[in-house]
Design a protein with these regions (language model features):
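Short, aromatic/His-centered strand-loop micro-motif at the edge of beta-sheets
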Residues: 73-96
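Extended recognition patches within non-cytosolic domains
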Residues: 10, 108, 114-115, 147-176
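Beta-strand-rich interaction surfaces with strong enrichment in secreted/lumenal proteins
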Residues: 25-28, 84-89, 120-122
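Short, solvent-exposed beta-strand-to-loop segments that form ligand-recognition rims
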Residues: 87, 111-131
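Extracellular glycan-interaction patches encoded by glycine-rich segments
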Residues: 77-84, 127-149, 153
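Short strand-turn-strand beta-turns centered on an Asx-Gly dipeptide
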Residues: 79-80, 102, 110-113
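Extracellular glycan-recognition modules
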Residues: 17-75, 101-107, 141-142, 153-164
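Low-complexity, glycine/proline/serine-rich flexible segments
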Residues: 1-32, 73, 127-129, 168
Length: 176
């Protein structure tokens, strides 16, 4: 935990990000082939710009990011390509999100167990920096303001059935 991240007992435990400079770093990097990132979140503010939530950053070219993009929609971004969710994220509301990408580049975003976006993303650059939760230390002003109680990384592209199963396993905890 770095800077403005606090732990709360709310909903059986959650990380609370201040939206200023707080983030969590993990040595766990995304696979360069198949992967999924799953997390539960509650955003405290709407954004007119970008709030980075999860991702591997790179000193060289490229990055892999999952964020809240302009107009408060989820986005999966890899090396200049992106897919954007259709659902507008409301403040003060809990959501379960899953981002997937398979080795052929097919990417999907699931929100509360339902597919919210699909498309093709470029290849993943091998990470030379840490996986970050709650912010992007290579850019300024892109910090998450809200709560993230659960974050999981998989070395496979979860199926629609698996994304729904994981949502169903968490929905009562967060009133989804």
């Amino acid at each position: 935990l770095t800077n403005g991240v606090a732990f709360s007992n709310e909903n059986e435990g959650t990380w609370d990000f201040d939206g200023v400079d707080g983030y969590i770093t993990s040595s766990r990097a995304l696979s360069t082939n198949n992967y999924s990132a799953e997390f539960v979140f509650n955003a405290d503010v709407n954004t007119s710009g970008t709030e980075h939530w999860l991702g591997n950053q790179y000193q060289g070219s490229g990055r892999t990011i999952f964020d809240l993009y302009t107009n408060n929609r989820l986005r999966s971004f890899i090396n200049g390509t992106s897919i954007n969710g259709a659902t507008t994220i409301e403040t003060g509301t809990w959501y379960h999100a899953v981002f997937t990408r398979n080795s052929s580049g097919l990417a999907k975003i699931y929100l509360n167990g339902v597919q919210d976006a699909t498309g093709t993303l470029s290849s993943v650059t091998p990470s030379d920096l840490a996986f970050e939760i709650g912010g992007d230390t290579t850019l300024t002003g892109r910090w998450f303001n809200g709560k993230i109680p659960l974050c999981r990384i998989y070395n496979k592209a979860l199926t629609a059935a698996e994304a729904l199963q994981n949502f169903n396993a968490q929905k009562s905890r967060f009133g989804l």
